[in-house]
């Protein structure tokens, strides 16, 4: 009898701890008028440090304080070192070899593609995985160099440890009003500045004015093209790091927009 009572108490304690490890939270990023302000279930809300690591082009790894790993736009052969990575989530903004090399990523990640099979129609993504919320925003990329066509792609928002991180995707123009409504609040932008096929430095600066993030990390550019110098035009405080990663939390965000340039070597630079 005593054994039965003890077992019941152990079970109740276990269930209580399991319940406490989850929390209902309203999104800090999504516009409640768009999202319906519906709460989502996460593990106990964390607000610890988030690591953002850049491998080149549009390829990042975002790691939450609880260890959840997100990979964005893994590339194929582009002249960058090929990292050995594993992830819980992989996002693909467009179907191109520079962005969709999912096979590179180890583990059994959930793969989220901004476009449906065939790449002609946008998908609607809204996923909660452990302590991370992921949703996407439809964008357009310029098609061919004469801009005669426009290709579809997707930007992604990651809500991690209370931070709202936007991966811009291969966007070609500043956001329109509908896109801004879908995006919501942004703390950090991983921002394309490459020009030609995507938005260039001047257009990217307009996006900063639209979203007013605290941190902007430029991507999708080569150091030798002068694009970075045009982007760091003195409008915002900027710094160049001698590393390919930063660690940031809600409490360590700068008071005003800061451009942070991460360093990635190409194979020939090693």
Task: State where each predicted segment sits.
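Glycine/Thr-rich phosphate-binding loops of Rossmann-like dinucleotide-binding domains
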Residues: 80, 99-101, 199, 226
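N-terminal secretory signal peptides that target proteins for export/translocation
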Residues: 1-6
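Bacterial N-terminal signal peptides
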Residues: 10-21
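Core dinuclear metal-dependent hydrolase active-site scaffold
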Residues: 26-85, 89, 113-184, 244-270
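Active-site neighborhood of phospho(di)ester-bond hydrolases with catalytic His/Asp-centered motifs
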Residues: 71-74, 86-107, 112-114, 166-169, ...
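P-loop/Walker A phosphate-binding loop and immediately adjacent motor/lid segment at beta-alpha junctions
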Residues: 44, 101-134, 205-221, 233-241
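Cap/insert and terminal regions of metallo-dependent hydrolase folds
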Residues: 173-265
